[in-house]
């Protein structure tokens, strides 16, 4: 809500920085809470991811609506009020949960449940190398696709910014549901072939994207975004399987530090590639990136028996 009181760009930048600082708690703490005490974490993480991606998909539409109806300040006031109310509700929820558990903290109640078995150091190092490498490359792919897709549609279709926004909303909304499918698969089958298949599908569809135009662009975009969004829960499931609960928040924090660092660097990269060669070259680079993820998943072969429950 502080951002709604800003009167110049410096104040807005300061307010947005504070929003980022406090919102940063979500991934390290929120994801650790989602997987706490669970044997099968794919579906819970997928549901969490769907809500997150739907939030991203709706953000532009709702923000535009609030700005049109009440001005730009309302775009900060309304989310601020909702966040405060949710925080108050969560505090009441925590208190009632502790009372029902006899006053014991939630961590004490769930301690020892669904903890991963001891993992050899070499195996752990291999798995985390794969996690962080695929996180970095996957973050580049995710940011590149979500950031560039509206511009791709504006070049392929004639229409207002609102129409282009609806095209993007359609793609992101449908694609977010892929996480549920992948979440179910990783809960019931080996992660390695699923991860490899998702990466290979991305590479193939990115290559196809360089060859299509018109309405086919929308169809292929939905297809490759299904694969891009489908990858989201896989790394989080791997972290939950190999890291004990007391270290899980730190592991998620490092993973998302890598993700957001790469995502920030993706924006100037997209601008440079598009300005120099166009989107065809960008999708060629994304196809190569997805192929590198596929190669990385092959290194899970010797460790997967250990990380599976």
Segments (PLM) and residue ranges:
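C-terminal ends and interior cores of transmembrane alpha-helices
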Residues: 1-7, 201-213
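Helix-loop-helix hairpin linking two adjacent transmembrane segments in secondary transporters
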Residues: 51-98
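A late C-terminal transmembrane helix in Major Facilitator Superfamily
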Residues: 242-277
